[in-house]
Amino acid sequence: MATIEECRAALEKLSDNMQQAEGDVRTAAALDRSVSCRITDLDVTFMGRLTGGRIVVHDTIQGPPPEKAQIRLTMAGDDLVALVDGELNFAKAWGSGRVKLEAGLRDLLQLRKLL
């Protein structure tokens, strides 16, 4: 099971990858939205913002997020690490329910370029 530190590092790596992206991926990463990433097996939520092509984590809280972020991810810690490391295909994980992504329709259309 991934630790909180490993999950935070995975989010940082994802953020770095997004900032270095080009083309459609860079455009999708340019959104300015609130973000939450709930790690179910650790019962922790990373709260932050997607801005300037990066995910900036502002807070880590126990349990579910107190407010609904504009972009919401939910998954196990190992799945987050595997996704960022390229060992888990997002589409398959999302289709099987291992990973949940919730956002407005317009944001979902943009985010599919990222994922």
PLM regions: where:
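Feature captures hydrophobic
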Residues: 1-115
